[in-house]
């Protein structure tokens, strides 16, 4: 009975250590297609349309039309999209490692509570 319980505890501890190691292992090397790499689908099924035409020249002479000052959100540079094929940054890796360590601590606490409960009875 005691050896069976010790075996179960050992298996729980080993799985608590191995599961985070497997979860934080490096993923596949092939980049998966992501949403920002996919072409925009047009609902009509036609080819892409150009929003600006380089062939048109405007014959408007005179001062340009007055425009308002750019709003603060317009002056913010656009966020750079990571083109590394889905690699995780250091913050994401740190968050995964911390979550794995917390999960291991929870499993270890459950094992300790179970051992105390069964040893008391």
Swiss-Prot record:
Source organism: Mus musculus (Mouse)
Designated gene of the protein: Snorc
Region listing for Disordered, in residue ranges: 26-84
Extracellular topological domain: 25-92
Transmembrane segments annotated in the record for this chain: 93-113
GO BP annotations, alphabetical order: cartilage development
Broad class of where this protein is predominantly found: membrane
Subcellular location: Membrane; Cytoplasm; Secreted, Extracellular space, Extracellular matrix
Protein name: Protein SNORC
GO cellular component terms listed in the entry, alphabetical order: cell periphery; collagen-containing extracellular matrix; cytoplasm; extracellular region; membrane
